[in-house]
Amino acid sequence: MKKFLCMMMAVLMVLAMAACAAKTTDTPAPAETDNKTDAVQETATEAAADGKTELNIGVLVWKYSDTYGSSVRVAMDKYAKEIGAEKGLTINLEMQDGNDDQATQNNQADVMFAAGKDHIIINLCDTSAGQYLVDLAKQYNVPISFYNKEPVDSTIVTGSNSIFVGTKPEEAGIMQGEILADLYAADPSRVDKNGDGKVATLEFEGEINNPEAIARTEYSLSTAIEKGVPCEMMTENQVANWDTAKAQEMMTAQIASLGVENIEVVFCNNDDMAIGVIAALNEVGYNLGDGGDEIIVIGVDCTDTAVEYINAGKLYGTVKQDGDAMGKANILMAINGALGKDWLDGTDYTMADDGFSIRIPYAKITAE
C-alpha cells in the first residue's frame, strides 16, 4: 500500500511539473513597455541593423525647368535603379519641384519629413534658407544631403547630419577665364575686335548670395585679367537668375544701351543664360554661326543645347559641370546616409578640405 501511495505521489509530482512547464511555454511573454510611443521614428541606422532592403528617399529640386538640374534628376533616377540593384536595395525616389520658391519647397519638406523618409536630398531654391530644412532633419532624425546650390552658411551643414555634393565654386570661373585667355593669346583680334587694347566685358550672374554664382563671376574676370586679357567691365553684373528668357531680356537692354558693336565678351554663370544672351545677339545679326559678326560668349554646364551651339559656331565655349556624376554622387550619399554608414563608405570620393563636402571636377569645352 505504501509503495502504491509513493508511486501515486511521484506520478502527481511529474504531472504537476509538466503542467507548469506547459503553462510557461504556452503563455505569451509580457509585452515590452511601450516607451517609444513619443519617440522619433526608427532611425536609418536602426533600420540598417534590422536588415532593411528598401529605402524611401525624397528629393527636393529648386526648379524642374533648369536644364542642368534636369540632367542631374535623370541621373539620380538612373543610378537609384542601377546602384540599388547592385546593393540588393529597392530605392524609391520621390521628387518634388520647388519651382524656384523657397516657401513651396519648405512645405514640400514638411510633408516629406513627416512621411518618414530614410534620407532627403535637397537642391535649395534659396541658398540662404537652408536652416529651416536642417532644423526639420534634426527634429525627425533624418540624414540629408544638399547638392549643386551650396548653403550660404556652411555651419548648418557641419553642425548637422548632412553633407554637400557640389563643385569648387571658383573652378568654373577660373576655367572660363582660361578659355578666354587661350583664345586671346592665339587670336587677339577675335576678342579685342576694335583693337583699342581693351576687351569690353559683360557678366551674367546666376543669383545674388549664391556662392557658386559669386565665385564664377569673380574668377572668370580675374583669371582672364591675370592671364593677360585686358578685360574692362561695361556695366554692373546682370543678375538673370540662371534663366534663358531673363538673360535674353537683359542682353537686349544692354545692346540697346551700349550698342552691340561695343560689346566684345560675355561671361555667363550657366549655359541657359548664355543661350538667352545669344538669342538677343541673333536678333541683331550676331552669333548666327555663319562666320559673320560674333561676340565671344562663354557659359557653364555643358548642356546638350550648349554643345549644339558650340558645334554651330554660336557659343564659343563652356565649362562642363557633370550632371551625371553629380546625380550618381547624390544617390551614393543618400544610400550611406539612410543606412547610417560613413558618407564615403564604399565610394571613391574624398572629403574636401572643408570637411563637409565632396566636389565634382569641371572640364573646359570648346570647338577647338
Give the positions of each predicted feature:
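Short, solvent-exposed amphipathic alpha-helices that sit
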Residues: Y68-G84, A172-Q176, P211-P230, K246, ...
